[in-house]
Amino acid sequence: MPSHTRARAVAIARDAKAAMDASTRARAATPRRAAGRARAATPRRRASGRATARGDAEATARTREDGDAGDARFSFRRHEACVRTTLRARCGEGLEEARVDDAFAARANAKRGVTTTTEAWSSRRLRRVRSTYVDGGEKAQIYNCAVYPACEACDAPVFGVDLICVGVGAARKILIGVDLQPMSRDRDYNDAYVPKLLKLRDGGALSACAEALNATTPSKKFYEDATYFSRGMFFARPALANEETMARSLDVVRAYLDVWLDRLDEAEREAEAMDGACKFGLSLEDVRRCVLTEASAREAQDAHDAWQLEHDPAIAMFASWYGEEWARDFAETVLFPGARG
């Protein structure tokens, strides 16, 4: 990894960790008498980290079923439920749950008050869906999801969601990132959907959301070597962790997911038409030529994972919570398995 890229990744993780630590210290400053009464009112029961994580994972599953549980406080649970429900309704044929090792499916750090849960699955239309949620109460709410289309839909991009809220008070940082991540820099590839995103975000149906969420252009310093981000990416830094931010960001996720599903439909039809024309010797004049082949689409998705493995600042954050070995194994086997080829 280039030194400037590593420095930025470490800086982001350090900022998030500092925000978490600040809120932890603030809680520690609570009068001891009140804290003592709270402890006395709580049954004394010890649980291992794995048992605690498993219990949190079961609670998470219940939350996913109703989609609204826990939304009395700021969270991205509704976003998680929306993506999961929509994908399973539109792309669930032939669904297979992917096995995620128990050590990675749920992990808790009781001292930090943070639990991380992950699920993964595939279907006929989707090569892989990986959804990760970090629940640290008021100190951390993070939802990250990556949806890889089946490689037969050669020119379909990867749908990515990255929603982050860490820290409390003045130390709180919120970031909203949603994109249809290109697997090729080819102009024809990007022209098939990026203009739709730009129209949607800049003066279209999401213009009010963009204003309310403080949408901005990602820093060139941070994204100068960003191979897998489109010009239509929705990137925002909301000032407040409130109901409006939850609702507006959910509107963004829904709208971008709709564009992605439409593009997936188109990419599948284009690939089928091109394949049929080639098989039967028909003219390709009226068929949009796919930029990628099934094989090159697979290679591009795997290259995406390899790039993310070296650049994603969340790995450093996970290392601060669960240790470097766990974080690296989690990144290589669960977050970005395509990096292994």
Task: Name what the model sees in each region.
Residues 5-9, 72, 76, 80, ...:
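Intrinsic-disorder-associated interaction segments
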Residues 286-340:
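Amphipathic alpha-helical packing elements
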Residues 61-143:
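Short Lys/Arg-enriched alpha/beta "domain-start" segment
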Residues 126, 133-176:
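Phosphate/adenylate-binding glycine loop and adjacent helical scaffold
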Residues 82, 91, 145, 151-154, ...:
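Generic recognition of cysteine residues
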Residues 1-65, 89:
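N-terminal chloroplast transit peptides
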Residues 173-301, 308:
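Mixed-charge (acidic/basic) macromolecular-recognition segments
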Residues 260-267, 271, 325-328, 337-341:
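Short secondary-structure junctions and interdomain/linker hinges
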